[in-house]
From Swiss-Prot:
Residues 143-171 are annotated as: Disordered. It comes from Brucella abortus (strain 2308). Residues 152-171 have a biased composition (Basic and acidic residues). Involved in urease metallocenter assembly. Binds nickel. Probably functions as a nickel donor during metallocenter assembly. The keyword Phosphoprotein does not apply. Its main location: cytoplasm. One of its GO terms (molecular function) is nickel cation binding. Belongs to the UreE family. It comes from the Bacteria. This is Urease accessory protein UreE 1. Keywords: Chaperone, Cytoplasm, Nickel, Nickel insertion, Virulence. One of its GO terms (cellular component) is cytoplasm. It is found in: Cytoplasm.
């Protein structure tokens, strides 16, 4: 089984035709070590030192030099629109406050479908439409793959009250 040993980001791809491709949903595009079956039926092993997030158009470089194109799957999403840019920002805040993955554009937001969230957003005045599209949400503050050390606990005001919590992964 050939191994994927490097990534070429979509904006760095030169016009070479890929040897094959694979279609992956958002959750499947976040990986570190995983066997993957390509569209041509061949199996490869993605084998990276750290977790990576693959985006539509990225290429995996195999240990034999071939390039495999990543294609983002179309997924069932909500397209959320607000009255104006400020309203969209408020809606984005509510979505982020619930720790939901979101693709935020200038005039709309995409999220994975969830009926409870739809009711909440409509209650906040949003127009919510069912769509099927590629989902490329923003990566969170902790998804950069770097390590940092705090050496202390945090006090956070959250949900109208203060509470302490400790980050054992940062020690």
């Amino acid at each position: 089984m050939f191994r994927a040993i490097a990534i070429i980001r979509a904006h760095e791809v030169i016009d070479a035709v890929p040897a094959s491709h694979i279609v992956l949903e958002r959750d499947e595009r976040h990986l570190r070590r995983k066997a993957i079956t390509l569209e041509n039926g061949e199996k490869i092993l993605a084998d990276f030192a750290e977790p990576v997030v693959l985006e539509h158009g990225d290429r995996l470089v195999l240990d034999d030099g071939r390039e495999i194109e990543i294609r983002a799957a179309s997924e069932e999403l909500y397209e959320i629109r607000g009255r104006d840019p400020r309203h969209i920002a408020e809606l984005a805040w509510h979505i982020g406050n619930r720790h939901l993955a979101a693709q935020i554009e200038t005039d709309h937001i995409f999220i994975l479908r969830d009926h409870v969230i739809r009711v909440m957003l409509e209650g906040l005045g949003a127009t919510v439409t069912d769509v099927v599209a590629i989902f490329s949400p923003l990566r969170g503050a902790y998804s950069g793959g770097h390590q940092h050390h705090h050496g202390h606990d945090h006090d956070h005001g959250h949900h109208g009250h203060d509470h302490d919590h400790h980050h054992p992964d940062h020690e």
